[in-house]
């Protein structure tokens, strides 16, 4: 693993901050100062920062069922609390954030982590990671309106809609590969419908547990994490 990445994972700082420590000569590998951020830390080598031995901590990966009324950002406002209020006491020293946003009046799956690279890849348009939603509308939607969803453009760019399947008269399962602000609501608004209920049920291969209640969370299994990384070709050893 590169030295700057090793420090980033050990100290939970940015790669930029890690490079600054290295450049200033505050980092030793096996007793010798190393000033190359790209230096590969080998198995068995000890890394020290200002005389203190450091080792990468295991990242946190959580599935959270975000309830309505909670922000998917780490900043709170006067009206709504952050999702962090639901998990903070269990991870007091971790800088956790959500991989992607979910409207404050929506509920469903939030992937919570401190793995910045994975979060970045899962939300980057390049990787086309699918997000699945259950959408209930203010009235029944017709087949022609459903077809028109595939033609909708926002800011002159087509919405990346993979599939829109009618589950009942007023309920649609929508799968998108993008996360623009209020994209689901704006998509349906473009064909004359208001969204009255929105729930995210899947991100990539990760599906919200059926027995999970709003506000509940669990850690992802090793296999679930591996599958997410495989989906976006993320090899943390690089």
UniProtKB/Swiss-Prot annotation:
It comes from the Bacteria. Keywords: Isomerase, RNA-binding. InterPro entries: PsdUridine_s_RsuA/RluB/E/F_cat, PsdUridine_synth_cat_dom_sf, PsdUridine_synth_RsuA/RluA, PsdUridine_synth_RsuA/RluB/E/F, PsdUridine_synth_RsuA/RluB_CS, RsuA_PseudoU_synthase, S4_RNA-bd, S4_RNA-bd_sf. The active site is at residue 103. Residues 1-64 form the S4 RNA-binding domain. One of its GO terms (molecular function) is RNA binding. SUPFAM superfamilies: Alpha-L RNA-binding motif (SSF55174), Pseudouridine synthase (SSF55120). The keyword RNA-binding applies. It is an enzyme of class 5 (isomerase). One of its GO terms (biological process) is enzyme-directed rRNA pseudouridine synthesis. Pfam families: PseudoU_synth_2, S4. Its EC number is 5.4.99.-. The keyword Cell wall biogenesis/degradation does not apply. It catalyses: a uridine in RNA = a pseudouridine in RNA. Belongs to the pseudouridine synthase RsuA family. This is Uncharacterized RNA pseudouridine synthase aq_554. It comes from Aquifex aeolicus (strain VF5).
